Amino acid sequence: MRHLLSAADLDRDAAVRVLDVAEEMAATQRREIKKLPTLRGRTVVNLFFEDSTRTRTSFEAAAKRLSADVINFSAKGSSVSKGESLKDTALTLEAMGADAVVVRHGSSGAPHRLAHAGWTRGAVVNAGDGTHEHPTQALLDAYTMRRHLTSGAGDLTGARVVIVGDVLHSRVARSNVLLLRTLGAHVTLVAPPTLLPVGVESWPCATSHDLDAALRDGAPDAVMMLRVQAERMDASKGSFFPSAREYGRRYGLGRQRLALLPEHTIVMHPGPMNRGLEISAEAADSARSTIVEQVGNGVAVRMAVLYLLLAGELPGGDA
């Protein structure tokens, strides 16, 4: 596989392979000396056209722990702010000898364009494109679930996952639905009708507008809360929900809803969180919460992705 652009690029064996390699990478990070020589002499460029804390620093840490040289590119402090196109930026990076380009862009499909337009010969990793996809987030979420819900090996066959919130604007939700289904999990999306995308009925998952019923009757193994992405909501199209208070009442995870969950259920969030809106402080900081763990797991998963793209072999996927 030359690129990782979508969770759909991975079949079951390829996805499990990434998770297995991530487990091996995580083991190396428990040692006193964490750095590996695997990608010495390779150059990884973090090309971020949107703000990011967790994803950008996670990819930077992953590449550096594999001994790659890292170039961090921010659109705000570059010629992009002067009108330079994605093509010209990519050609500049190609001239610098980039072996991999990790790209986050506000336009859906930008990483695919970068990978297939002939502007770069390096591997392209989608670190989030618009409201489309975020495959490495889905991989780290699946990795986190596997560590808690299985023996830490194999797939997620039979696991029940409820994803709650702003699905309409969430690239995380899309990638998770695709990957979790590939790994054998059953996924239910819960959101108000205004925050579900057109065509969601064709996604490989169930949908519901009733969070209490989904938690009480679905007996989920994992509940993933999604951030309400107010910055992507066009006010000219009207309100997506009556008020923040009403949204929290209907779709927020707090003390009462935590009590509906089976004892083993984990609580997840891809971050950043709106505490007090989609998730209460009590839920976010509870013993069930894996939110901080997810951030740490992201480094191991992204180490695995970079290793398999640049030094290993990942079967299937985008050629």
From Swiss-Prot:
Keywords: Pyrimidine biosynthesis, Transferase. Its EC number is 2.1.3.2. GO terms for cellular component: cytosol. Carbamoyl phosphate binds at residues 54-55, 104, 134, 137, 271-272. It is an enzyme of class 2 (transferase). Pfam families: OTCace (PF00185), OTCace_N (PF02729). GO terms for molecular function: amino acid binding; aspartate carbamoyltransferase activity. One of its GO terms (biological process) is 'de novo' UMP biosynthetic process. L-aspartate binds at residues 82, 171, 227. It comes from the Bacteria. Pathway: Pyrimidine metabolism; UMP biosynthesis via de novo pathway; (S)-dihydroorotate from bicarbonate: step 2/3. It catalyses: carbamoyl phosphate + L-aspartate = N-carbamoyl-L-aspartate + phosphate + H(+). The keyword Transferase applies. NCBIfam families: asp_carb_tr, PRK00856.1. Belongs to the aspartate/ornithine carbamoyltransferase superfamily. ATCase family. Heterododecamer (2C3:3R2) of six catalytic PyrB chains organized as two trimers (C3), and six regulatory PyrI chains organized as three dimers (R2). Catalyzes the condensation of carbamoyl phosphate and aspartate to form carbamoyl aspartate and inorganic phosphate, the committed step in the de novo pyrimidine nucleotide biosynthesis pathway. This is Aspartate carbamoyltransferase catalytic subunit. The gene is pyrB.
